[in-house]
Amino acid sequence: MKAIISLLLISAMVFSMFEAVPVRRRFTAFEGERGCLPHNRFCNALSGPRCCTGLKCKELSIWDSRCLG
């Protein structure tokens, strides 16, 4: 009985170590989608002059401030 309890405790400790590692992976299929922030509909400032349409970052026309494509 003690062996079973010890085995359960050890497996719980091992599982908790694996559980502590964050598993956040974002999938960006295209280069143009990188930097799009859907919560405020703007692209990341580091991605250049771009804007969000839907969930995709598109090029921003400098002359008339609208999305191209």
Swiss-Prot record:
Keywords: Amidation, Disulfide bond, Knottin, Neurotoxin, Secreted, Signal, Toxin. It is found in: Secreted. Transmembrane segments: none annotated. GO terms for cellular component: extracellular region. The modification Leucine amide is found at L68. Expressed by the venom gland. GO terms for molecular function: toxin activity. Disulfide bonds join C36-C52, C43-C57, C51-C67. SUPFAM superfamilies: omega toxin-like. Residues 21-34 form a propeptide. Residues 1-20 form the signal peptide. Insect active toxin causing rapid but reversible paralysis in crickets. No activity shown in mammals. Does not show effect on mammalian voltage-gated calcium channels. The presence of a 'disulfide through disulfide knot' structurally defines this protein as a knottin. Belongs to the neurotoxin 01 (U2-agtx) family. This is U2-agatoxin-Ao1o. It comes from Agelena orientalis.
